[in-house]
Amino acid sequence: MAILNHTLGFPRVGLRRELKKAQESYWAGNSTQEELLAVGRELRARHWQQQQQAGVDLVPVGDFAWYDHVLTTSLLLGNVPARHQNADGTIDLDTLFRLGRGRAPTGEPAAAAEMTKWFNTNYHYMVPEFHKGQQFKLGWSQLLDEVDEALALGHKIKPVLLGPVTYLWLGKVKGEPFDRLSLLNDILPVYQQVLAELAKRGVEWVQIDEPALVLELPQAWLNAFKPAYDALQGQVKLLLTTYFDSVGHNLDTLRELPVQGLHVDLVGGHDDIAVLNKALPKEWLLSLGVINGRNVWRADLSNWFERLQPLVGSRPLWIGTSCSLLHSPIDLSVETRLDEEVKSWFAFALQKCGELALLSAALNAPGAAKQAELDAYSAPIRARRQSSRVHNAQVGQRLAAITAQDSERQRPYAERAQAQRERFNLPAWPTTTIGSFPQTTEIRGLRLDFKQGRLDGNNYRTSISEHIKQAIVEQERLGLDVLVHGEAERNDMVEYFGENLDGFVFTQNGWVQSYGSRCVKPPVIIGDISRPEAITVEWAKYAQSLTDKPVKGMLTGPVTILCWSFPREDVTREVIAKQIALALRDEVEDLEKAGIGIIQIDEPALREGLPLRQSDWAAYLNWAVDAFKLNAAVAKDDTQIHTHMCYCEFNDIMDSIAALDADVITIETSRSDMDLLEAFKEFEYPNEIGPGVYDIHSPNVPSVEWIEALLRKAAQNIPAERLWVNPDCGLKTRGWPETRQSLANMVLAAQRLREQQA
């Protein structure tokens, strides 16, 4: 029996981000819906054709989404919140966009659905909303329409459907509390209807995604899989698909299910292939995810051939990507600025399709010629292990020399706080911002001109200096207590540091979707990380020279730089994080020498880096916290270390937040009405806190009374002497008019509280 290969999904946005541009044009009213639909059809046809030409046996259909595939599933099931429903009950493309964005060219604006991370990736999905007694019906035919499209084009296809249990797991209850799992029997008839429609079209296999099976699920949720799949069996063959981690701990549940195949992720997970092969019913197809869908590295096909060949003939086998290629850039061939050595180490989505074809061909017809092909393909991986671009002996030596004391400040917080009060003499309720100020068209144009050689270094620095000066003048005029330089020189909080550290490379077109039309271009960590020279000191020192008030030095923390980059695969994430920490430790020391007394080390991704299974959290948090402390602990007692985190769940990691031992932590709290601070109160968090007093994601200007009320509420949880006053996050995406007005109101609210306290 032949071993087929398949992908679990393909990037949607297009090589030149065509989907993003078409979406934003439509939203702005500059193009019609038919023009947008035409772009979608063209992209789908191109991507199916590209996969087929690369040698993929079964192309996925249903992986395309206008905004997000979980949102697409909500519409498929007719799950549209009342605030977004059309008067006639129909669902259209603008319904989808209102759910995703809060507004669309037609229909009334209303609050968008909540957005959160898709498992442990940097992709975001729109959270389904569930109400007690909710009804479901087949409401959106996108999947069936796209199957018809692909079949008409002559492709061998495998429709992709998010499974019912994972769909419910990913959602949230709204209104009267109830168990959302109780809705399972209500959504199953819609799934049955969809599968029946696919069977009518001659579909043999359906990829039904249940990634929740890699989690440590409550028993009630595990018990739900058997009745769910009992209801879905019999119409088409079901490939139960898991990814991002192992499934071995849920094997007892899995092997009782009436499905015809199982896909496992052998890259993100560490399941023993032999154990799986023995444990699963012999008639089942076993699909092995061997090509990493989440990274950019060339696969070691020789190694995979050795691992997989013993299974050939033992059962029906497929090979595939570990997960959807959604998380990978599209095509390496258009990267013209990467040097050939580094380029030979990479594979993007199209190249990964070629890897599948090469490996499946070798497994189907092994022999000396095929082995030579695999060895030749894998040769750059072996060469990379010896490359001077990868290994820096000094970094290794420095890492090996780390002691426990290197991660500890000289004195405990209480003693440091006294030294810092004496140094800075700040008022009660000190005011500050998180770091960035509005990135105007002029600022972005300056950076682009400099990057493309249209502006020389001297003129660039002069222009950036003027913008920094403007930011300082604005802050002094507003009456802020601790200032920032505004980050005019930075395009992105991770990319800026990656560009100035050895061990990183950057792509021209390595875009991946983050959510909706937003795409990011992560740096790639290719080798040992070091800092050849100071990165931020020049600008921080200049900004400090313009004012008598303290100016914060601004760094992105090691865990965030790691999480928002494509990491190496030949060393652990812990090693990478600590290499970054050592490089930035030198930056802290240099900032101190330049007279900067307050240094902020942002770690918004600390929680995002958590493993999927809670039993694995402790090991991660130990090294993640240690990396932050290694970065910060070189600071003197009277240097105040700030950190910023912008997520909304602290309760289960409060021990680790406290263990960071930052002198001040600023957090995102305005949208939760300060409720997040209860976790800090219950934990008796000992250090200083700046709860965000207004939401920077909205152009709305908060009133003085609103901010004052939030701060009073904050003071019920945290002693006033340990409270700071600041926005939720950086102001990069805002305009100057609302920024000035919002900050003026914030400063006035703090002044009122000081007067009342006096």
Swiss-Prot record:
Binding site for L-methionine: I434, G435, S436, E487, D602
Cofactor-binding details, from the entry: Binds 1 zinc ion per subunit.
Protein name: 5-methyltetrahydropteroyltriglutamate--homocysteine methyltransferase
Record bears the keyword Isomerase: no
CDD domains: CIMS_C_terminal_like, CIMS_N_terminal_like
Pathway named in the protein's UniProt entry: Amino-acid biosynthesis; L-methionine biosynthesis via de novo pathway; L-methionine from L-homocysteine (MetE route): step 1/1
Keyword Nuclease in annotation: no
A GO molecular-function descriptor: 5-methyltetrahydropteroyltriglutamate-homocysteine S-methyltransferase activity
NCBIfam families for the chain: met_syn_B12ind, PRK05222.1
Function: Catalyzes the transfer of a methyl group from 5-methyltetrahydrofolate to homocysteine resulting in methionine formation.
EC number(s) from the headed UniProt entry: 2.1.1.14
Binding site for Zn(2+): H644, C646, E668, C729
Keywords: Amino-acid biosynthesis, Metal-binding, Methionine biosynthesis, Methyltransferase, Repeat, Transferase, Zinc
SUPFAM superfamilies: UROD/MetE-like
Cofactor: Zn(2+)
Catalytic site positions: H697 (proton donor)
Catalytic reactions on record: 5-methyltetrahydropteroyltri-L-glutamate + L-homocysteine = tetrahydropteroyltri-L-glutamate + L-methionine
Residues that hold 5-methyltetrahydropteroyltri-L-glutamate according to the record: R17, E18, L19, K20, K117, R518, C519, W564, E608
Signal peptide: none
Pfam annotation, one family: Meth_synt_2
